[in-house]
């Protein structure tokens, strides 16, 4: 037999539940309305940005290039391949020599003291889903790169591409490249919230969507055997402090200085992927993430996505089990530092 208290509780629930249902519907409606509004604004911003690119003389066609570096060095040639979007192409750099591809190939050649062939199959305006076509172009060339660098994510944010979908295509690309014997370095999505032409609240929305995508990219890259390097700093504090210097004239892409900063962050990881360390230094100490430890993988990846030039790579524990993930500031490669670890 029910007590008076139980009856009152049941009645209260009967009264509250419909109100909660109505409130949920109202919240869902507001959320849907906000999402729709952001979607419309984002699409308009994307069309506007595309118009600026076309007006500046950029196209959405492939600009596949092949260049050789360090021909005066002896030894077998290293194959370096770039895939991705306009950042991989070098839109806004002003000259081929200032693009991230040229800077990485030149730096790798000097570090390895071997000739390097750079093959760039990136396409301006590409989203993660279009990596499939770039992989096909690479397969048609029958090239097996030693190191492949992927720079993608900004257009996924601009076009509100679903994060799971973007991650699926990136994971596929990393798997395919690994099967071809390449070591893969992925520059995770930059913070699109720092692009000045975007207005609030779109800038705030782009900021958090960029972080979520970068976190997801880090996880899927690790799970498929690649290296993930945060490029948040390429449009981070230094871009806020000196936008006229770090952004190109279109205010959307990095300038030559901006690309130089990106290459500075990426180069140590590219060299390490090829089996070389810069400046003759030893191994850099790793911050360790332990599976089942205090923080989940998603938290660790999110923290990495917020730190300038942080590289995350798969690692193993002292028993050889793949239970760890290790990260290090990419720009610290080659420096002799005390050997310390953080759980």
Give the ranges of each region predicted by the language model.
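Conserved catalytic region of serine esterases and O-acyltransferases that act on ester linkages
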Residues: 2-52, 261-343
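N-terminal signal-anchor transmembrane helix
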Residues: 48-79
């Amino acid at each position: 037999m029910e007590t008076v208290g139980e009856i009152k509780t049941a009645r209260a629930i009967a009264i509250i539940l419909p109100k909660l249902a109505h409130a949920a519907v109202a919240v869902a409606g507001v959320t849907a309305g906000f999402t729709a509004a952001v979607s419309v604004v984002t699409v308009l911003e994307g069309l506007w940005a595309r118009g600026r690119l076309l007006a500046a003389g950029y196209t959405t066609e492939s600009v596949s290039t092949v260049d050789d570096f360090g021909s005066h060095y002896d030894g077998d040639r290293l194959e370096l391949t770039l895939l991705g979007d306009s950042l991989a192409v070098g839109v806004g750099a002003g000259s081929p020599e200032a693009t991230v591809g040229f800077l990485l190939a030149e730096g790798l050649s000097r570090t390895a003291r071997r000739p390097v062939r750079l093959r760039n199959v990136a396409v301006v305006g590409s989203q993660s889903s279009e990596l499939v076509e770039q992989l096909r172009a690479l397969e048609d060339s029958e090239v097996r790169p030693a190191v492949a660098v992927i720079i993608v994510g900004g257009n996924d944010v601009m076009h509100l591409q679903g994060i799971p979908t973007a991650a699926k295509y990136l994971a596929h690309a990393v798997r395919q490249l690994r099967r071809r014997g390449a070591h893969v370095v992925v520059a995770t999505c930059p913070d699109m919230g720092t692009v000045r032409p975007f207005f609030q609240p779109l800038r705030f929305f782009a900021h958090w969507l960029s972080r979520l995508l970068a976190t997801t990219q880090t996880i899927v890259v690790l799970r498929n055997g690649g290296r993930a390097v945060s490029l948040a700093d390429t449009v981070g504090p230094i871009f806020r402090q000196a936008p006229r210097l770090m952004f190109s004239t279109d205010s959307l892409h990095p300038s030559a200085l901006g690309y130089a900063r990106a290459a500075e962050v990426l180069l140590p990881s590219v060299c390490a992927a090829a089996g070389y360390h810069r400046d003759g230094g030893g191994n850099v100490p790793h911050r360790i993430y332990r599976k089942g430890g205090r923080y989940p993988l998603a938290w660790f990846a999110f923290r990495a996505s917020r730190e300038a030039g942080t590289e995350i790579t798969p690692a193993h524990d002292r028993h050889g089990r793949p239970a760890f993930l290790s990260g290090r500031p990419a720009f610290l490669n080659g420096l002799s530092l005390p050997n310390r670890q953080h759980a």
